[in-house]
């Protein structure tokens, strides 16, 4: 089995080394194609106005000056040639990718692009706690990832479906279990725009999230609830985002 690994945190990110270690427990034919620079939050963007620069940094390890989507395309269509990968793994992301994160995430996008190209694809993310100074416990993803992947691969992943796996912010032995979840909904009141001034007094801005305690109880069955309870969250995501229920309403309204 040929595995293509990518991420959005960049070619030198610790999580990329973890996903490669996970991949090597599944196969010895592992290729890494990742962004040269941090591409967090770029979503499914594709470089159309700038050329892509490809740099081989080691055997089967390549850096692309582009987005995670660019990396998967370069890996599947150029570096690996006609055969392409049998599996795409994107991650392991530093921080969870749940709820609305999936819209912004370059990690999710890497897996989505793999699925679009016809390959079974997984996004993997490691939640971290500020109690641990924001350092993820990578060993949790490494300990639990391979077995979860094997079971899902043996089951088979439907076409046009991506598997989003999030590991909780706890030690491997403290993981309660695995839950199949749906995408949750977060309180976006935490989103903020931080205005600052440069040396000339001109304004510039950062978009971020308030580091405050979460008071909302996540809905049962969601990715948010699973992580809060110490479970690994496994969420199947579909490429087809059509709202079939509201489509029926619109048919009545517009018919």
Swiss-Prot record:
Gene Ontology MF terms: 3'-nucleotidase activity; 5'-nucleotidase activity; exopolyphosphatase activity; metal ion binding; nucleotide binding
Known catalytic reactions: a ribonucleoside 5'-phosphate + H2O = a ribonucleoside + phosphate
Subcellular location: Cytoplasm
The keyword Cell inner membrane belongs to this UniProt entry's keyword annotation: no
Residues noted as binding a divalent metal cation in the record, renumbered to the chain: 8-9, 40, 93
Sorted UniProt keywords: Cytoplasm, Hydrolase, Metal-binding, Nucleotide-binding
Gene3D superfamilies linked to this entry: Survival protein SurE-like phosphatase/nucleotidase (3.40.1210.10)
Cofactor: how bound: Binds 1 divalent metal cation per subunit.
GO cellular component, one term: cytoplasm
Cofactors named for this entry: a divalent metal cation
Enzyme Commission number, as recorded: 3.1.3.5
PANTHER family given in the database record: 5'-NUCLEOTIDASE SURE, 5'_3'-NUCLEOTIDASE SURE
Protein family membership: Belongs to the SurE nucleotidase family.
NCBIfam families xref list: PRK00346.1-4, surE
Function: Nucleotidase that shows phosphatase activity on nucleoside 5'-monophosphates.
This protein's name: 5'-nucleotidase SurE
